Amino acid sequence: MSKHNLIENLKKQIEPIVEGLNYELYHIEFVKEGKENYLRIYIDSENGASLEGCEKVSRAVSELLDDIDPIQESYYLEVSSPGIDRVLYTDKHLEKYKGYNIILNLYSPIDKKKKYEGELIDFNENEINIKVEENIVTIPREKISKTTLKGEL
C-alpha cells in the first residue's frame, strides 16, 4: 500500500475517534527520521489541544492501531497539537486563518524571493493572495512548497 493510501485509510478510521473525543483531526503523517518511523497525528480544537487530550487520543488511536495493524514495520505513535506556527495543509485551514499572517515558502523564486510573509487575504484553487506591507501579492499555488501560520503570541 502506498504511503498516500495508508494515510487516507488511517484518516477514515482515526477521524471518528478523534471527533468522539471533541477534537479535530488536523493532519496525519507517516515519516522516517534516521532509522525510526513515526506516525504523527495532529489534533486541534477551539481551545487547542491539551496534554491530557493528546494522551486520551493517543490511547484510543493506539487501541485501534493494535486491532487493525495497518503498518507492517515498527513505528512510534505521536499525538500532538499542530503548534502555534502550524503548517496550513488544506483549504479549510486557509479559510480559518484568513486575516492572519502566514509564510509562503516557494519551490523557486518569484521576483528573486523564495519566501513571502504577509496577511492572508484570499485564496482559490490556483493562487493565494497575501498583503505584504501595503501591496497585494498573488502567488500561484503550484509554486508554493509550504504554507505556515506565522506564530505570534
UniProtKB/Swiss-Prot annotation:
Keywords of the record, alphabetical order, are: Cytoplasm, Ribosome biogenesis
> What's the chief localization of this chain?
cytoplasm
* Gene Ontology CC annotation, any one: cytosol
What span is annotated as the signal peptide, if there is one? none
Q: Name one GO biological process term.
A: ribosomal small subunit assembly
> CDD domains, alphabetically?
YlxS_C
Q: Which Pfam families match?
A: DUF150_C, RimP_N
**Looking at the keywords, is tRNA processing present?**
no
Q: Which compartment or compartments is the protein found in?
A: Cytoplasm
The job of this chain, per UniProt, is described as: Required for maturation of 30S ribosomal subunits.
In the record, the note on similarity to other proteins reads:
Belongs to the RimP family.
Q: What is this protein called?
A: Ribosome maturation factor RimP
Query: What is the native source organism of this protein?
Result: Clostridium botulinum (strain Loch Maree / Type A3)
| The organism's taxonomic lineage, starting at the top | Bacteria, Bacillati, Bacillota, Clostridia, Eubacteriales
- Gene, per the UniProt record: rimP
